[in-house]
């Protein structure tokens, strides 16, 4: 049976239980191989084990029944005890209710008795108090103070209580009959008040907070209580401003007083508020005035910096003081204190800001032009000047000489950074110093100054000067520096746009000025882009003009119709080499001067014009067979140059031109087949015919029949 119990190990798994039983049975497991297996022995062991399990089950069942009977017995006993306890609890609760009713009855009697005693005692106490006051009043009436309360210095608290009450009584007495005694009481009242204030002062100097609290409590009912607070505030500030930073000193002072004032006065928030008011209206106001008045008229830059710094530090101090208990509306209280200090400076702040920003911006620009030994010229507008400009844009007529700027763009990133930095500081000051209702309007005024000096006086002037410096398209070896102007103008536009978004937008985002600023910015940028487009267009005209000069000077008629057809080296001509070198140089300059889609747009325009020039140039010559091969070599080199543009349309144009040049060399019998090829099939027959007409054998080979 013990063996059977051992087999019931936790956790119990039936399959493992059978395996362990088989394993323990000799001849039952796999030990010894198949020969050692004894099924009869295993069956016998299983039968015996089943009998053991049945016996064990019976024993366990009897034990379970015994335990169930025991549980039922204990449950009945427990239920009986619970019933007895419930009865006992009910009896106790009834006793408790009776006792509670009795206590309530007694309490009612006691309260009634207390009210009766108080009704008797209160008049008696008042009578005793009145008797004492009459006694003290008689002493003042007789002119001789004999009572210990007046003669003993240690009883100043009791004397103060008496004299305060006598003072109130004396005020109700007629003056004609009691003028003398009223005067004596008033004199004593004043003397005691002075003694108490002196005692408070001495206690404060000794650092005796408990004594200060006692005296302040007595003085609370005297007229001189406010004077006591003034004395406390004055003495608190003695030696408080020893550092160079008055704002930090003030913060430390208020923190120290805030910890102490509640232990002394019954109205600590009022005392602390009065201290803060004194600090602001006396100490800080005097300091701010000293700092600002000396530079207000003489140095606008220093004045604005100091005003911003002082206002910022004052508001920072105010934020620290917001942590203290100053009453119900401490935000309004502190705001009024700040306003009282700065109101005279803030009411005309924006005028000073605008005046300074204008003069500073003008100085930055003038300093730059002086460094270039350049005298700004006035840009003509309207009337004849506009007419000449329109004619100049649409034709190549030289309407007066162009201005030689010696490659100077008159754009300076340093100047731009300085102007933006000045404006950024102005925006920061505007944000801090402007009234919230005036902020969008003031920010817009600063923005207009930035537009005036950065966009108009600097960028627009440089663009106008750059436009005036672009030579006519028939000029030779022209210095096309306008692309440098484009590059610098793009960089400046990005900086201008960044400042607009980072510093102006937060100030106007929720006001009607937002749309006005966006519109002004849009107009400025459109105006600049129009001038940039004009300049780029004229620069491209100059580039094409320079290519024309190269081709006219370098290309000879004999290049494409050599005298000795058998002694010709098949390669591109010298004119082609020079044109391609020039084009590659200009393409690189365009890529360096612009970014994004602007590069593709300008390169496509240049590529289209380059293709048109090449096409028209090739139309000027007659081609022999070898000359046609040379023309194909030239166009192949032009096409290779066009690949640098990385514009699919331009490359397609030169591919088509290359295919057209094949018409110059193809055998007459194959001409029709080539014309119907993939690249030429979509072209107008007149274009194909015009190229075939350039062949030297056009008439002799009767090539016109292919187009009839």
Swiss-Prot record:
The modification Phosphothreonine is found at residues 122, 395, 405. One of its GO terms (molecular function) is small GTPase binding. It is found in: Cytoplasm; Midbody. GO terms for biological process: epithelial cell apoptotic process; establishment of planar polarity; exocytosis; Golgi to plasma membrane transport; negative regulation of apoptotic process; non-motile cilium assembly; protein localization to plasma membrane; protein transport. InterPro entries: Sec10-like (IPR009976), Sec10_HB (IPR048627), Sec10_N (IPR048625). Ubiquitous. The modification Phosphoserine is found at residue 412. Keywords: Acetylation, Coiled coil, Cytoplasm, Exocytosis, Phosphoprotein, Protein transport, Transport. Disulfide bonds: none annotated. Signal peptide: none annotated. One of its GO terms (cellular component) is exocyst. It comes from the Eukaryota. Residues 40-101 form a coiled coil. The modification N-acetylalanine is found at residue 2. PANTHER family: EXOCYST COMPLEX COMPONENT 5, SEC10. Belongs to the SEC10 family. The exocyst complex is composed of EXOC1, EXOC2, EXOC3, EXOC4, EXOC5, EXOC6, EXOC7 and EXOC8. Interacts with EXOC3L1. Component of the exocyst complex involved in the docking of exocytic vesicles with fusion sites on the plasma membrane. This is Exocyst complex component 5.
């Amino acid at each position: 049976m013990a063996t059977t119990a051992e087999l019931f190990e936790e956790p119990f798994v039936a399959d493992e239980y059978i395996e362990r039983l088989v394993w323990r049975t000799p001849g039952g497991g796999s030990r010894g191989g198949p020969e050692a297996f004894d099924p009869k022995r295993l069956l016998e062991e299983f039968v015996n084990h089943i009998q053991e399990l049945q016996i064990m089950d019976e024993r366990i069942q009897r034990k379970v029944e015994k335990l169930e009977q025991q549980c039922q017995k204990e449950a009945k006993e427990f239920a009986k005890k619970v019933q007895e306890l419930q009865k006992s609890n009910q009896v106790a609760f009834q006793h408790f209710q009776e006792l509670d009713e009795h206590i309530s009855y007694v309490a009612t009697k006691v309260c009634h008795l207390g009210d009766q005693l108080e009704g008797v005692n209160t008049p008696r106490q008042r009578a005793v108090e009145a008797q004492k006051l009459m006694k003290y009043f008689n002493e003042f009436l007789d002119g001789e103070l004999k009572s210990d309360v007046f003669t003993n210095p240690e009883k100043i608290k009791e004397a103060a209580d008496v004299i305060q009450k006598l003072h109130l009584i004396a005020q109700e007495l007629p003056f004609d009959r009691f003028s003398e005694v009223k005067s004596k009481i008033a004199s004593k009242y004043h003397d005691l008040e002075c003694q108490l204030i002196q005692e408070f002062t001495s206690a404060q100097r000794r650092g005796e907070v408990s004594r200060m609290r006692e005296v302040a409590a007595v003085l609370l009912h005297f007229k001189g209580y406010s004077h006591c607070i003034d004395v406390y505030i004055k003495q608190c500030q003695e030696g408080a401003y020893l550092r160079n930073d008055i704002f930090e000193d003030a913060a430390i002072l208020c923190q120290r007083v805030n910890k102490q004032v509640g232990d002394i006065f019954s109205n600590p928030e009022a005392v602390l508020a009065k201290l803060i008011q004194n600090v602001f209206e006396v100490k800080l106001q005097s300091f701010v005035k000293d700092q600002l008045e000396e530079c207000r008229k003489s140095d606008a830059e220093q004045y604005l910096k100091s005003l911003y710094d002082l206002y910022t530090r004052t508001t920072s101090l105010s934020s620290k003081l917001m942590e203290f208990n100053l009453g119900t509306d401490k935000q309004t209280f502190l705001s009024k204190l700040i306003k009282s200090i700065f109101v005279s400076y803030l009411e005309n702040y924006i005028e000073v800001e605008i005046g300074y920003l204008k003069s500073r911006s003008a100085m930055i620009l003038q300093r730059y032009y002086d460094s270039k030994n350049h005298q700004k010229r006035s840009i003509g507008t309207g009337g004849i000047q506009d007419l000449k400009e329109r004619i100049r844009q649409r034709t190549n007529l030289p309407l007066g000489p162009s201005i030689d700027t010696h490659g100077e763009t008159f754009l300076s990133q340093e100047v731009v950074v300085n102007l933006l930095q000045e404006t950024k500081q102005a925006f920061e000051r505007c944000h801090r110093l402007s009234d919230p209702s005036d902020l969008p309007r003031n920010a817009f005024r600063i923005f207009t100054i930035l537009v005036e000096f950065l966009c108009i006086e600097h960028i627009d002037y440089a663009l106008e000067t750059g436009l005036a410096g672009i030579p006519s398209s028939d000029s030779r070896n022209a210095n096309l520096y306008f692309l440098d102007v484009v590059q610098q103008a793009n960089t400046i536009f990005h900086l201008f746009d960044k400042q607009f978004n980072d510093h102006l937008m937060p100030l106007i985002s929720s006001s009607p000025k937002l749309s006005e600023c966006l519109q002004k910015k849009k107009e400025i940028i459109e105006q600049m882009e129009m001038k940039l487009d004009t300049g780029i267009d004229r620069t491209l005209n100059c580039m094409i003009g320079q290519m024309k000069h190269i081709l006219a000077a370098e290309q000879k008629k004999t290049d494409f119709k050599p005298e000795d057809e058998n002694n010709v080296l098949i390669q591109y001509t010298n004119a082609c080499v020079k044109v391609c070198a020039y084009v590659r140089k200009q393409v690189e300059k365009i890529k360096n001067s612009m970014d994004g889609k602007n590069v593709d747009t300008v390169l496509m325009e240049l590529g289209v014009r380059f293709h048109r020039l090449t096409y028209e140039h090739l139309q000027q010559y007659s081609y022999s067979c070898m000359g046609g091969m040379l023309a194909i070599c030239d166009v192949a080199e032009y096409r290779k140059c066009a690949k640098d543009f990385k514009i699919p349309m331009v490359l397609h144009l030169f591919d088509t031109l290359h295919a057209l040049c094949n018409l110059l060399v193809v055998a007459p019998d194959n001409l029709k087949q080539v014309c119907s090829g993939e690249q030429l099939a979509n072209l107008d027959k007149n274009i194909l015919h015009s190229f075939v007409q350039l062949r030297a054998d056009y008439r002799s080979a009767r090539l016109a029949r292919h187009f009839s």
